[in-house]
C-alpha cells in the first residue's frame, strides 16, 4: 500500500528513482504476501482434518512412533466416522493399493519407497507387513507420522497407508498428497 502510494505520488517530470523505489516496494510486498495468501486459499479448499487413511473403517494404528508423538497436539488415534466422512468427500481417490506381489515382497518395496521419499523409517517388519515412518515437510519442517500395512489379498497384497500430522487442525491436504504420491511410486513397479 505504501509502495503504491509512492508510485502515484512520484513526480512524473522528475527523476525516476522515486518511482523505481515505489515499484520495488510493491514487488517485495506482493512477494511477501504470496506465501500466506496461498496457504489461506489452500486451507479453504480442503476440510480441517489432519488424519488421512486408505482404510477409514479400520485405519492402521501406530505403535513404534508413539514415543516420538509424546506431547504432540494431535492424537495418534483416528478421529472416527466424522473424520472419515470428511476425508471420503474431499479425497475419494485415496484408496488401498492392490499389488500382484507377495506380502513380503510388497512390504520390502514399500520400505524402499518410504526411504526414497526421504522418510525416516522408525520400524519395518517385513514378516508382519508393517512400516512406521516420520515424514518432515520441506519448508516448515513439520513432522507427520506414516504407517503402512501390507496384508494378503486374493491376487497378491493389499497396501494401506495412514498419514497423521502431529500439529495443526488442518494439514492443508499434505497427508492426502503424501499417500497418493507414495502409492503411485509403489504401484509403478507392479
Task: Label the model's feature ranges.
Residues 3-21, 35-190:
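Ser/Thr-rich, low-complexity intrinsically disordered terminal regions
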Residues 21-29:
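Serine/threonine-enriched low-complexity regions in disordered or flexible coil/loop segments
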Residues 32:
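Contiguous mid-protein beta-loop-alpha structural module that forms a pocket-lining wall or clamp
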Amino acid at each position: 500500500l505504501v509502495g503504491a502510494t509512492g508510485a502515484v505520488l512520484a513526480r512524473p517530470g522528475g527523476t525516476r528513482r522515486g518511482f523505481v523505489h515505489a515499484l520495488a516496494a510493491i514487488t517485495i510486498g506482493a512477494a511477501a504476501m504470496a506465501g500466506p495468501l496461498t496457504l489461506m486459499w489452500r486451507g479453504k479448499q480442503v476440510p480441517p482434518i489432519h488424519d488421512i487413511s486408505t482404510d477409514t473403517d479400520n485405519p492402521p494404528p501406530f505403535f513404534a512412533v508413539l514415543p516420538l508423538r509424546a506431547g504432540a497436539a494431535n492424537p495418534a488415534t483416528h478421529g472416527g466416522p466424522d473424520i472419515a466422512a470428511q476425508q471420503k468427500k474431499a479425497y475419494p481417490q485415496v484408496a488401498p493399493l492392490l499389488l500382484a506381489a507377495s506380502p513380503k515382497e510388497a512390504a520390502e518395496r514399500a520400505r524402499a519407497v518410504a526411504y526414497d521419499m526421504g522418510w525416516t523409517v522408525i520400524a519395518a517388519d517385513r514378516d508382519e507387513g508393517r512400516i512406521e515412518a516420520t515424514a518432515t515437510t520441506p519448508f516448515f519442517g513439520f513432522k507427520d507420522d506414516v504407517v503402512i500395512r501390507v496384508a494378503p489379498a486374493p491376487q497378491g497384497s493389499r497396501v494401506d497407508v495412514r498419514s497423521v500430522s502431529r500439529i495443526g487442525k488442518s494439514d492443508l491436504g499434505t497427508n492426502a498428497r503424501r499417500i497418493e504420491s507414495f502409492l503411485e511410486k509403489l504401484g509403478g513397479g507392479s
